[in-house]
Amino acid sequence: MSTALGAFCVQIIRFFEELVDTFPEERDIKLGLEAIQGARKINPKLILDLFYEHVYRDAHEFIEQENDDGLVTYAKAKVNSQFNEMSSALLIFDKHWETMADSNRSAIWKYMKVLCVLCAKAKGLAPLTPSASTPTQTPKA
């Protein structure tokens, strides 16, 4: 397991453990944690691929900007359209974000930002910067 992939797996498990402790009534989060822990033993890259597909690809800009409205809207749509191991984490944005304490929101933003950075690193993606996200034309020969 690559260092970046290993760090990503450790961090996402810690995130889910924190969510289980914070929202013990949410059975889906506990089941998500168990699925991720099992996948880490068998195929850790699967966890990375799920996060990339269901969180990073469409929501990393919301996370980087701490855009509550964008992420809550995305999470609601994702949870309602396609349930998977990442859905249980997105569920907190759908069900609990509005009533959550600022300290919990801050902790979740920090986890999500770190997970996005580790995901990009493990996937070999360029860090997102304004110049990297803006299309440029290459000069014609």
Where are these regions (language model features)?
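Terminal low-complexity "docking" segments
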Residues: 1-106, 120-134, 138-139
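Short, hydrophobic/amphipathic alpha-helical patches that form generic packing surfaces
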Residues: 110-121
